[in-house]
């Protein structure tokens, strides 16, 4: 006997029919009636179901009325031929009944030992449904019931150990019920079952410890309770129990995991059966091909063992089980379905899938491999980083893994998205042990919190040193400060800072400020205590101090603008509120909001004026005003001249005001002539206009002049080979030896080699001595 086949022995002490119920009370010696799952014998292999012709002439099509499955299942040529019928095969009879059992005499049949109590089967190699003999006539059949022997056992599929826990597998899809007669035509349905349902074929994996592993190999079934008690050999592996569930169409068994519906275009095993006489369209049914048809391509279903959703569905439904030989498992076909399961360890699931697929599609001859072999890949992952996942298997074999959130149920394609989403949940944040006191950061590791707090300390240190030394500007980050200093460097390369009182030039403003304080300190006696900047007048220093204090005493009367300088306020009013400035009369100082009112008021002054100017249309109200107008406008002579600058004025009052400016301001003397002015800008304008020739291009090093720029560029090349003189006290450098000497003496030396001939006061440069003599001793230089 093959080691995969199990020898069955009858149970003599207790009959199978002891607890069947009231339907089995009236029985005689020749009749045994059992009400079990309804099964319809459709036809032999010559029956055509909706243009469906099986390839194997010995195959039989069976319709399961209760479970709505149309199956062409096994090789019947070895079972149904009269010459091959033996005592080793149990061939029960099919009996018609709608809801109750009927007594049918079996004396007419030529199988004398069919109801013998001692019949056993040494090799029961049959599929899910037991087939009947050809000698039984079922032409007037509406619904059938199976009549089986008391020693017929429940069906169990023996498999290798897959998992230690019982887990159910959803592997079937919803189909519709249809009953076919012997000619292959559909019959009217007498049940009021739902047409659209969702039936699932449930497969569960039991532990070996649940079976009584003793010497006896008897297997019995209790038809009422639906529970089983099995006794197997000690070497027998785990058991896969197969049952079909009747699911409610309004309830989703998988919850939010997946809504899997078979496509009518992709599923090649579905067909529609139509009544030829009534032309009534019967709901679609599933047709399963025989295992001998190796030419047909069949879609495979990958079975994923779930831990949560699939495990909870098998407990609520009865189980219909059968036992078959392991060598004939290849003849049983599973419907195509989408399966989904939540798992905590995807690697163990892959191992279970490989084992289950190999057992359900075992074919030693290499004829038909329904599920491709998969190699298990075990990767050790830390338990703290495990995430719950869901696996979806499509009919074409493609799998899709998603990661659902354990708090809200949302699904994500990758673990990274799930991890980012989970961090926003308050439930996740509440589990953190360590929380940062400076921000919202939290963590479970103390070292991570320590590293995070160090980043706060570095931020505080950088905030203290983010002030620019050149312009005193506060910056937010140290990197921004470096970029800002680079801007100062670039500006210094392209721009040179020049002293307006001497020939000193430098690339940085700070060095120029230092030069002004050291060299020209006497010219700027009023120095700011905050930044060290010097001013000539205390009013200028007072205005500058407002920059540091933030004081803005000048307010705009039309808006909220404030300024520290009155000139800035005037500019603001002219640019922003030019339309709002009232019109003011130049004679009586009256103000007007409208231009028309101002013009009407001016007419009144014109009418009151009786003194007409003989040179123009000007009128005055008195003679003195008319005389002043004629002298200032129509007279070229300036009889009133200034003694200090020889500037002429029309009136003595104007000259008096001009002389006051000479007394209040210091005079700036021209180096080339006797011209002096209290305004340094006027002095610069004088030098450019009077003492500068019309030469556009001049060398800055040797002061040589050129008429064209190309000549100046050619001349500048001659200075490139000269020696560069670098000052050891500052960053000043030059290629002119005399200029370098002058720089050292004037900036970094306390000696005053040039002394005044009248007061013996010393100066660093001759120009300073000459300016002193002209200003204080009133002596012209030759």
Curated annotation (Swiss-Prot):
It comes from the Eukaryota. Residues 211-233, 360-386 are annotated as: Disordered. Residues 373-382 have a biased composition (Basic residues). InterPro entries: C2H2-ZF_domain, Transcrp_activ_Zfx/Zfy-dom, Znf_C2H2_sf, Znf_C2H2_type. A motif (Nuclear localization signal) lies at residues 372-382. GO terms for biological process: regulation of DNA-templated transcription. GO terms for cellular component: nucleus. SMART domains: ZnF_C2H2. SUPFAM superfamilies: beta-beta-alpha zinc fingers. It holds the Pfam family Zfx_Zfy_act. Keywords: Activator, DNA-binding, Metal-binding, Nucleus, Repeat, Transcription, Transcription regulation, Zinc, Zinc-finger. Residues 217-229 have a biased composition (Polar residues). GO terms for molecular function: DNA binding; zinc ion binding. It is found in: Nucleus. The keyword Transcription regulation applies. Transmembrane segments: none annotated. The binding of ZFY to DNA is mediated by the interaction of the GGCC core base pairs with zinc fingers 12 and 13. Probable transcriptional activator. Binds to the consensus sequence 5'-AGGCCY-3'. This is Zinc finger Y-chromosomal protein 1. It comes from Mus musculus (Mouse). The lineage of its organism: Eukaryota, Metazoa, Chordata, Craniata, Vertebrata.
């Amino acid at each position: 006997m093959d080691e995969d086949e199990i020898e069955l022995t009858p149970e003599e002490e207790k009959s199978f029919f002891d607890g069947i119920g009231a339907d089995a009370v009236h029985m005689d010696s020749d009749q045994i009636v059992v009400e079990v799952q309804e099964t319809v014998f459709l036809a032999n292999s010559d029956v055509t179901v909706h243009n469906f012709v099986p390839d194997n002439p010995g195959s039989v099509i069976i319709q399961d009325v209760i479970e709505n499955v149309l199956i062409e299942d096994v090789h019947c040529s070895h079972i149904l031929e009269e010459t091959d019928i033996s005592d080793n095969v149990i061939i029960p009879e099919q009996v018609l009944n709608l809801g109750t059992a009927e007594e049918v005499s079996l004396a007419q049949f030529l199988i004398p030992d069919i109801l013998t109590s001692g019949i056993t089967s040494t090799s029961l190699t049959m599929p899910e449904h037991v087939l009947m003999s050809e000698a039984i006539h079922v032409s007037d059949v509406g619904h059938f019931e199976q009549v089986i022997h008391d020693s017929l056992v429940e069906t169990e599929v023996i498999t290798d150990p897959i998992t230690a826990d019982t887990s159910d597998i959803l592997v079937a899809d919803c189909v519709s019920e249809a009953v076919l007669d012997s000619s292959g035509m559909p019959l009217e349905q007498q049940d009021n079952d739902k047409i659209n349902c969702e039936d699932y074929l449930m497969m569960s994996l039991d532990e070996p410890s649940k079976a009584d592993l003793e010497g006896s190999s008897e297997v019995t079934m209790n038809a009422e309770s639906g529970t089983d008690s099995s006794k197997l050999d000690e070497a027998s592996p785990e058991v896969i129990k197969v049952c079909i569930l009747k699911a409610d169409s309004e309830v989703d068994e998988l919850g939010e995991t997946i809504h899997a519906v078979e496509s009518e275009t992709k599923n090649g095993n579905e067909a529609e059966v139509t009544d030829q006489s009534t032309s009534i369209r019967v709901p679609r049914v599933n047709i399963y091909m025989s295992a001998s048809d190796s030419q047909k391509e069949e879609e495979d279903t990958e079975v994923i063992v779930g831990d949560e959703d699939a495990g909870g569905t098998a407990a609520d439904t009865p189980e219909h089980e059968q036992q078959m030989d392991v060598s004939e498992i290849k003849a049983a076909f599973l419907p195509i379905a989408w399966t989904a399961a939540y798992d905590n360890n995807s690697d163990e699931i892959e191992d279970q899938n490989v084992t289950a697929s190999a057992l359900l599609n075992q074919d030693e001859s290499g004829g038909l491999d329904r599920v491709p072999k998969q190699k298990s890949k075990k990767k050790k992952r830390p338990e703290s980083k495990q995430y719950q996942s869901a696996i979806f298997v499509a009919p074409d074999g493609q799998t899709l893994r998603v990661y659902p959130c354990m708090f809200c149920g949302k699904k994500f394609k990758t673990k990274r998205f799930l991890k980012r989403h989970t961090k926003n949940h308050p439930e996740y944040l509440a589990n953190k042990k360590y929380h940062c006191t400076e921000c919202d950061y939290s963590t479970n590791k103390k070292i991570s919190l320590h590293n995070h707090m160090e980043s706060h300390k570095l931020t505080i240190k950088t905030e203290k040193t983010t002030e620019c030394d050149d312009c005193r500007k506060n910056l937010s980050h140290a990197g921004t400060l470096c970029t800002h200093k680079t801007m100062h460097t670039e500006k210094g390369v392209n721009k040179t800072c020049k002293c307006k009182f001497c020939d000193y030039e430098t690339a940085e403003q700070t060095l120029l400020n230092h030069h002004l304080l050291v060299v020209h300190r006497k010219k700027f006696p009023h120095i700011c205590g905050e930044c060290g900047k010097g001013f000539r007048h205390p009013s200028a220093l007072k205005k500058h101090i407002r920059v540091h204090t933030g004081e803005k005493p000048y307010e705009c009367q039309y808006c909220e603008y404030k300024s520290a300088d009155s000139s800035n306020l005037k500019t603001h009013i002219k640019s922003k509120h030019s339309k709002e400035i009232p019109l003011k009369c130049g004679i009586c100082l009256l103000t007007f909001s409208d231009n028309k009112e101002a013009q009407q008021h001016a007419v009144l002054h014109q009418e009151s004026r009786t003194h007409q100017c003989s040179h123009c249309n000007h009128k005055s109200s008195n003679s003195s005003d008319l005389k002043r107008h004629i002298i200032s406008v129509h007279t070229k002579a300036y009889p009133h001249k200034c003694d200090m600058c020889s500037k002429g004025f029309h009136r003595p009052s104007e000259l008096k005001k001009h002389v006051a400016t000479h007394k209040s301001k210091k005079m700036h003397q021209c180096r080339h002539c006797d011209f002096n002015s209290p305004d340094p800008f006027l002095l610069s304008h004088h030098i450019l206009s009077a003492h500068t020739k019309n030469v556009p291009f001049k060398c800055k090093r040797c002061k040589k002049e050129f008429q064209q720029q190309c000549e100046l560029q050619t001349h500048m090349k001659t200075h490139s080979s000269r020696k560069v003189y670098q000052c050891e006290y500052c960053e000043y450098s030059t290629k002119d030896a005399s200029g370098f000497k002058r720089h050292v003496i004037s900036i970094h030396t306390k000696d005053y080699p040039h002394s005044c001939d009248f007061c013996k006061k010393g100066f660093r440069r001759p120009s300073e001595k000459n300016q002193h003599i002209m200003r204080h001793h009133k002596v012209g230089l030759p």
